[in-house]
Amino acid sequence: GYSLEDAFRHPVYPALAFLTAPMNCPVEKINAAAFGEMLSRARQMFDYVFLDAPAGVDAGFRLTAQFADRFLVVTGAGPAAVRDAARVGELLELAGKTNAKLIVNRVDKDLLSTVRLTIDDVMDAAGLPLAGIVPEDPHVTLAASFGQSLLRYSPNCKAAKASRRIARRIQGFHEPIALR
């Protein structure tokens, strides 16, 4: 199995570490108690621990939801994605997990206008308060293609600025929410 000692330290951001899920181990075979113990140790080592659950509400979602204390539900603005976000919000609420917020990703302001949809509509449909909006931005794909962090590749692009605002909100700072 993996341990915190296996965490990969980012070469550019040494305070950032990643521990990826094992590719050859189905979520159903992960020992929930051991996973919880590892997260307890991680919480002592790091200021923030993010668990990236797979899309949908399968075993990966249930495992991470069991141990997380705050949730960022990331969705697109399309109808199917918003329905999935609403389902995730409902399941979290049923589990007594009420500290969930919504990030609407890859938002195309012109497309939203064309289909007469607003971010408020997305929030209402998902039933979650908004943590942030990340606009559609080709720099995201370019940065990934070149194996670089978006914040290094194009620090002033729209998606990078939106990501920084979301990070500051997570840290408790007041940052305006706007689709720019």
Where is each model-derived feature located?
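Short histidine/acidic/glycine/proline-rich micro-motifs that form metal-
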Residues: 24-25, 106-110, 156
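Conserved catalytic-core segment of NTP-binding enzymes
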Residues: 33-136, 142
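NTP-binding/hydrolysis catalytic cores, primarily Walker-type P-loop NTPases
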Residues: 145-180
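Short, surface-exposed alpha-helical recognition segments that flank or form part
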Residues: 26-30, 76, 80, 154, ...
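P-loop/Walker-type NTP enzyme "switch/lid" segment
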Residues: 1-44, 140-152
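Amphipathic alpha-helical transducer elements in NTP-driven molecular machines
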Residues: 1, 5, 32, 36, ...
